Curated annotation (Swiss-Prot):
It comes from Botryotinia fuckeliana (strain B05.10) (Noble rot fungus). This is Nucleolar protein 9. InterPro entries: ARM-like (IPR011989), ARM-type_fold (IPR016024), NOP9 (IPR040000), Pumilio_RNA-bd_rpt (IPR001313). Residues 1-52, 193-213 are annotated as: Disordered. Pfam families: PUF_NOP9. Belongs to the NOP9 family. Pumilio repeats lie at residues 118-153, 154-189, 230-270, 372-407, 408-445, 614-653. GO terms for molecular function: RNA binding.
Length: 791
């Protein structure tokens, strides 16, 4: 055997061979790392030489266009990693906070104080951790104002890096949003501020002397302004950063005092893909504070103006125009432009001497053909991203500038722009601001295109035209005729074509499931998901029903031409059920009454001719057993008994007929979840026992959803399933307690104990004796007299 093929045996030779292999691998790794460093250094030198040759510095500050963040990973500071024990502790704390299963608020406050004590000095690590950043968000949701201020102080000096971090940016957004209310409370409510200070001291009492030393005395306003000072000088790069752009929008909305919970604001704050970090049982319903405009200090308004001026100073016109079409920077630019145009002190025209965003985008007279402003607007009106900036301009621009843009760009081309899928949204913004004369001219131009718009299922334009005609008191006759011609002359098909659904599909979607066999369980009925065209068609029909005159008459005549089976199917389908609900509403005051139409429609639903429906039970019961149909019954209850509507007074007999139709099917309704809702909303227990009291209640509007319920009890289903729990209110006849009796078998009315016959007789006897002077005033035990019975 050759020597080179001989393999040494033994432990020492094996270890020696492994050491030699490891040395060879280390040498190869060193060589590869040196080559990698050389390649990186050469790339940096190439980039440096490229930037040195390029005189335009704006493009070099536009890193998001290449898919990188504003702050490079190499320049971002490293805060360290949590140890395994720390990660396990914080992970467990996150689970406990998410469950929120604490015996009391004091126990939860004590737990929060302990978590904050463990997290002291590790806040930056937790915020940047993929597994623990959710814990930081939940801590912020439950923190006191003093604890939030401490987080501000811990994050201070690192905000430019945190807002551009993948995980820490969400923590910053939550901290800013949850701290917005504290600014307003410190500004307007000194008493609340003192109360919160006392609560903060109690919450931090566990920290001892250290908590007193670390107490933050600065106002939340100053902490926000200090955060803005850190971000100053980097706004142009943050605008296009993948993560920081969202945080910057949050800051701008908080500084402007805009509502935080409105749908238009929420779309700016976060995307639909954002993970919703919540806490079980925590009340997150929108409050009056979050739905209305907030009071903010003047320093915040000055800060917005400074941000806009710094943004303009750091970017030239070419960069801002590129930003218009940038998917990340466009929403920030929209918000900055809206804040500038809605600020009274900076509301200037496009060719203003003051350098603003609008004057940068539209530097010259747009009415001149071939001007830079005209070229810019014509270039973005068809752009999927840039058209959103044009929507903002047409919505918030001053009247003089709006008229210039309308006459130069839209007036002669409005029909062609309305046909385009993207430009039509800009046209909608334009139509919302047109005068009556301009609106009538626009209708004349668009009317020949109605048939094409209907064929493409773009009914948004048609809906807006009808609504603006009602607002401007313009004639809708010609527009309604064009709509009727576009959908065809057959009234039986108008609603179905408008809702973009065939009769066969509608019947199959709303057909009852087949009965269950002994071997196979009953299949669960799954309704198909409505398409966008069905949704837009339903909205168009609802808008036409709200406009008295030809639009409403067109839909009403089409509904009356339908058989009962089709009306029932429309009532059961999730999208078209809203059309039936809108048709049941009374007509507005000072408009032609729709009483006759509503009476015919309701009669066709509750009293169909024999064989009109395929279901064995009456249509009212079919509606009661459907989640969509229950809304129809609620509309029938409120629209036939509304006390403020004189036209509904004569329809009350129909309401009684519906209640009579529900009575024989009480067991079937009580076995169904939706049936129990209908039985409760219609106060059927009161109808069954005391008809006169039921009539008074429904005529006064004191039905479910309108009455002031004093207490609630939760009832489980007959099988005890906790998932089938239905809330049941204590109504006037004692609904929610067996046989209308309260504790101790005493009847209750409106949440109060009803006096028995013997007690009433005693009162009468005592009053007579007192009047004759033969009886002393002795209060009855356990009885508190009120009103005329007080002695």
């Amino acid at each position: 055997m050759p020597k080179e093929n001989k393999h040494a045996r033994g432990r020492r030779d094996t270890l020696k061979r492994k050491r030699e292999e490891n040395l060879d691998r280390e040498e190869d790794h060193d060589n590869d790392s040196q080559d990698l460093k050389k390649r990186r250094s050469s790339q940096i030198e190439d980039e440096a030489s490229f930037r040195a040759l390029d005189n335009d510095q704006t493009l070099s500050s536009f890193p998001a266009a290449t898919g990188t963040n504003a702050i490079e990973v190499a320049d971002r500071p490293y805060y360290g990693l949590l140890e395994d024990e720390e990660q396990e502790y914080f992970r467990r704390a996150d689970e406990l906070l998410e469950l929120n299963d604490f015996p009391s608020d004091e126990e939860r406050s004590l737990f929060l104080a302990n978590v904050y004590r463990e997290a002291k000095g590790k806040e930056l690590k937790i915020a940047c951790s993929q597994s623990c950043s959710r814990l930081m968000e939940r801590l912020i949701l439950l923190s006191t104002p003093q604890q939030k201020k401490k987080l501000f102080s811990q994050f201070a000096g690192n905000f430019p890096h945190l807002v551009s971090h993948r995980f820490a940016s969400h923590c910053c957004e939550t901290l800013f949003i949850q701290s917005a209310s504290i600014v307003t409370e410190e500004l307007t409510g000194e008493e609340k501020k003192e109360e919160k200070k006392v609560a903060d001291v109690k919450a931090d009492a566990e920290d001892g002397e250290e908590g007193k030393e670390d107490e933050i005395t600065e106002s939340m306003e100053s902490l926000f302004l200090a955060t803005l000072d850190e971000l100053e000088g980097q706004l142009s790069s943050l605008l296009t950063d993948r993560f920081a752009s969202h945080t910057l929008r949050v800051l701008l909305i908080i500084l402007s005092g805009r509502p935080l919970e409105k749908s238009s604001t929420k779309s700016l704050l976060q995307s639909k893909k954002k993970e919703k970090v919540g806490i079980n049982g925590l009340d997150t319903a929108p409050t009056e504070f979050s739905l209305n405009k907030r009071t903010v200090p003047e320093s915040f308004l000055w800060a917005i103006e400074k941000i806009i001026s710094d943004t303009i100073a750091s970017m030239d016109r070419a960069f801002i125009q590129v930003l218009v079409g940038h998917p990340t920077g466009n929403p920030c630019l929209q918000l900055l432009l809206e804040l500038e145009l809605t600020n009274p002190s900076s509301k200037k025209g496009g060719n203003s001497e003051q350098k603003t965003l609008i004057s940068t985008l539209l530097p010259d007279d747009i009415t001149v053909e071939g001007s830079q402003s005209a070229i810019f607007v014509n270039g973005i009106v068809y752009d999927q991203i840039g058209s959103r900036v044009l929507e903002t301009i047409m919505t918030h621009s001053p009247g003089k500038l709006f008229k210039q843009i309308y006459r130069a760009i839209f007036k002669d081309r409005i029909a062609g722009l309305a046909r385009n899928e993207i430009a039509s949204y800009v046209v909608i913004r334009v139509l919302n601001r047109l005068s009556k004369e301009d609106l009538e001219e626009a209708i004349t131009e668009i009317s020949p295109q109605i048939e094409g718009l209907v064929g493409r299922q773009r009914t948004n334009i048609i809906k807006v035209l009808l609504e603006r005609c009602q607002v401007r008191r313009a004639s809708t006759e010609a527009l309604t005729k064009s709509i009727a011609d576009a959908y065809g002359s057959d009234k039986n098909e108008l609603i179905l074509k408008m809702a973009d659904i065939s009769l066969e599909t509608l019947t199959l979607a709303t057909a009852p499931p087949p009965a269950a066999d002994d071997d196979k369980p009953a299949p669960v009925a799954v309704l198909p998901k409505p398409s966008p065209s069905q949704l837009h068609g339903s909205l168009l029909a609802q808008a036409m029903l709200k406009i008295p005159g030809p639009p409403a008459q067109l839909i009403q005549s089409s509904l009356l031409a339908l058989p009962t089976s089709t009306i029932l199917a429309l009532s059961l389908y999730p999208t078209t059920t809203h059309i039936i609900q809108a048709s049941l509403l009374p007509s507005p005051p000072n408009t032609p009454s729709n009483l006759l139409f509503r009476r015919k429609l309701i009669n066709s639903i509750i009293s169909p001719p024999a064989g009109a429906t395929s279901t064995p039970q009456p249509p009212i019961i079919t509606l009661s057993l459907s989640s969509a149909g229950t809304h129809i019954l609620d509309s029938l209850l409120h629209t036939t008994t509304t006390p403020t509507s004189t036209s509904s007074a004569s329809l009350f007999s129909l309401c009684e007929r519906i209640a009579m139709s529900l009575m024989p099917y009480e067991p079937l309704l009580r076995d169904s979840w939706t049936g129990r809702i209908v039985w409760r909303n219609w106060s059927m227990d009161l109808f069954k026992r005391r008809r006169a009291d039921w009539v008074k209640r429904v005529k006064s509007g004191d039905t479910q959803g309108k009455s002031n319920i004093q207490s609630q009890v939760v009832l489980k289903s007959q099988d005890g399933n906790a998932n089938a729990v239905v809330g049941k209110e204590i109504l006037g006849d004692g609904i929610g307690k067996p046989h209308g009796k309260g504790k101790g078998g005493e009847k209750e009315i409106g949440g109060e104990r009803q006096k028995s016959a013997i007690e009433l007789a005693r009162e009468k006897f005592a009053a007579q004796k007192l009047a004759s002077g033969k009886l002393k005033t002795i209060p009855l035990k356990g009885f508190k007299a009120t009103g005329a019975n007080a002695i």
